[in-house]
UniProtKB/Swiss-Prot annotation:
The gene is add. This is Adenosine deaminase. GO terms for biological process: adenosine catabolic process; hypoxanthine salvage; inosine biosynthetic process; nucleotide metabolic process; purine ribonucleoside monophosphate biosynthetic process. It comes from Aliivibrio fischeri (strain ATCC 700601 / ES114) (Vibrio fischeri). GO terms for cellular component: cytosol. Binds 1 zinc ion per subunit. GO terms for molecular function: 2'-deoxyadenosine deaminase activity; adenosine deaminase activity; zinc ion binding.
Length: 333
């Protein structure tokens, strides 16, 4: 259950994993692309999860049609703008929208720096028009290797003053964190914060690596942390947040069932964990679903959900004054 008098945040929300089916159809036709289907319901199983996928990589393939229709920078701008509208429609007060410009640019050879600028423009316009607050997190897609990630980081850093953090996402097993230590030295030099997808497809060691070698202050998913009690204690003691995505973890087969999800164990250890969507359009869910449907399946109590909602603002990459402004706004509702 969502408490209206508290700010609602979504800190782990992929902009390029949230492209509307209608937009995929519209842009596909605009650019004359061969789509697997040409009406919404026939296209849905190609771009949205209809049952759990066998792996993270299989899940990620559902995102491919969304970025395949990004035929020019205006399309990127449109998708970014629509993402802000979707967040508003989901009752979200503050969203951190993350995106991989290399992945968005890849199909149509768009300039990476141009994609970054288009996304910034689209999100800023959306925030003006829809009256919600959003910030951007740039992703390096480890799936494509070290060189591609360097190109991606170079593009992201052209707009570093418009970003709050850098993330490492993609094939965690095939491209481990130690390959990207030099990339994150540059992130530190740029004075950007770090969140890393870790402990999703690989084990607790991947999370230690993200924290100790890459400088992560938040971890995306992190479900494998429960295999290492010392890591759990470290997360709690050092205030390292876990961006939890319940439905996503089921759909990627990262976790076998809602009942076995480790989010309750995080809370028991005093780890700051928050609730997020991940890829809403691909999953066919929104943030209220996670609070009202997924969380009760996990067995979270109303008091635990309240703490999770509070954690979402505490962990946000915002200044204390920005957080306080959101608290005051929500308290008046």
């Amino acid at each position: 259950m969502i408490i209206k008098q508290l700010p609602l945040t979504d800190l782990h929300r992929h902009l390029d994993g949230n492209i509307r089916i209608e937009t995929i159809l519209d842009l596909g036709q605009k650019f004359g692309l061969d789509l697997p289907a040409y009406d919404i319901e026939a296209l849905r199983p190609h771009v949205q999860i209809v049952e759990a996928e066998p792996s993270l990589v299989a899940f990620l393939s559902k995102l491919d049609w969304g970025v395949a229709v990004l035929g020019d920078l205006d399309a990127c701008r449109r998708v970014a703008y629509e993402n802000v509208q979707d967040a508003m429609n989901a009752q979200i007060d503050y969203a951190e929208l993350r995106f991989s410009p290399y992945y968005m640019a890849m199909k149509h050879n768009l300039p990476i720096a141009g994609v970054v600028e288009a996304v910034v423009d689209g999100v800023e316009a959306g925030c003006r028009d829809f009256g919600i607050k959003a910030n951007l997190i740039g992703i390096m897609s480890r799936t494509f290797g070290q060189d591609a990630c360097q190109q991606e980081l170079d593009g992201l850093l052209t707009q570093k003053h418009k970003l709050v953090a850098i993330d490492l996402a993609g094939d965690e097993l095939g491209q481990p964190g130690d390959l990207f230590v030099n990339h994150f030295k540059q992130v530190k030099d740029a004075d950007l914060r770090v969140t890393v997808h870790a402990g999703e497809a690989a084990g607790a060691a991947s999370m230690w690596q993200a924290i100790n070698e890459l400088g992560a202050v938040r971890i995306g998913h992190g479900v494998k942390a429960i295999e290492d009690p010392k890591l759990m204690e470290y997360l709690a003691k050092n205030n390292i947040g876990i961006e939890s995505c319940l439905t996503s973890n089921i759909q990627t087969s990262t976790v076998a069932s809602f009942e076995s999800h480790p989010i309750k164990t995080f809370l028991d250890y005093g780890v700051k964990v928050c609730l997020n969507t991940d890829d809403p359009a691909v999953e066919g869910i929104e943030l209220p679903h996670e609070y009202e449907v997924a969380a009760p399946k996990v067995g979270l109590t109303p008091e635990q959900l309240k703490q999770i909602q509070i954690n979402g603002l505490d962990l946000a990459f915002l200044s204390d004054s920005e957080k306080q402004a959101l608290r005051e706004m929500a308290a008046k509702r």
